[in-house]
């Protein structure tokens, strides 16, 4: 039987499958056509994410059904070098108390004309 897989870019892929095919087999066929690794694929049908190890017939997927393909988002811990870089560019700043302009740590006066280049500066508050 033929099913369709719609990607986020709007393209539709036609796949030739059997009702007894597992979700892993479908993901492997998508990898053959699109080059997306199976571990990054998430298949959605009838507002449900399809679990690996189950078959198409388990989800009542019939001929000419459309599955939706979305990519898995990977999260994790930031590397220490990226944290240091974020601190340098976002946290280690001074702020003008009058116009709230962000300034470098070594600044003594504000760079904005709106507050008259005042010297009333404070360190930017840390995130909690």
From Swiss-Prot:
Cited CDD domains: Ubl_ubiquitin
An example Gene Ontology molecular-function term: structural constituent of ribosome
UniProt GO BP: translation
Pfam families: Ribosomal_L40e, ubiquitin
UniProt xrefs under PROSITE patterns: UBIQUITIN_2 (PS50053)
Keyword Nucleus among UniProt keywords: yes
Nucleus recorded as keyword: yes
Entry superkingdom: Eukaryota
Domain Ubiquitin-like, chain residue ranges per copy: 1-76
GO CC list: cytoplasm; nucleus; ribonucleoprotein complex; ribosome
Family: In the N-terminal section; belongs to the ubiquitin family.
Protein name: Ubiquitin-ribosomal protein eL40 fusion protein
Designated gene of the protein: UB-EP52
